[in-house]
Amino acid sequence: HFVRYGLVPKREQRPGVDAAELGTLYHEAAERFTHAVTALPEFPEVSVEVCDKLMDEAVSPLIDAWRESPMGESRRGEAVARRIRRTAKRTARNIVSQYADSSFRPMQMEFVFGQNGLSPIVLELGNGTFVYLQGRIDRVDVMTGGGLRVIDYKSGSRKFDPTLVYWGLQLQLLLYLAAALARVPGSHAAGFFYCR
């Protein structure tokens, strides 16, 4: 209590690119882009040029805000900003491709569970203890017939590894899918994916 409220520690600001900050930027850009692109009458048949334009409109204000930081003003910051823009445009094309190649349509961005009065995922451990999980799923898509898929945006290189799932070391996507299924009556599992 004393440390948290008396000393009020803050994270040290070190020069360099903060991966968590960039991850948040990518998430926000992907969410803004998805809202914009799915509102188009021609969606999901959207050209690369339109994808790039919409993502540029989504990511530019975020990059501008980031560039106001000491890191963003440096030469390295300029290079990082160019990389952010390139990666964001690639992500935009991937998002549209996911919809164009399937019968899925977006159901909800930032799908919350275990917060704001919504039920958490409840797990009972072997010793009888309960664990209550809460979270926020980047995107949930639905297809005709009630199939749900969850999408988690990743800016890093993480890939799905069934061996890690088997050993209980990579359960995030499975838990997200369980949370979505619990909140949507009559739905069934249709998949879970990382999107870069």
Question: Where does each model-flagged region fall?
Answer:
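C-terminal, charged and often intrinsically disordered regions of DNA end-processing helicases
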Residues: H1-A36, F130
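Short, well-ordered loop/turn and helix-capping segments at boundaries between secondary-structure elements
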Residues: R4-V8, E31-H35, A39, G156-K159, ...
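Secondary-structure capping and boundary motifs in well-ordered enzyme cores
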Residues: D18-L25, S47-V59, R76, V80-T87, ...
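Substrate-binding beta-hairpin/strand module that engages nucleic acids
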Residues: E42-V46, V50, F111-G114, L177-R196
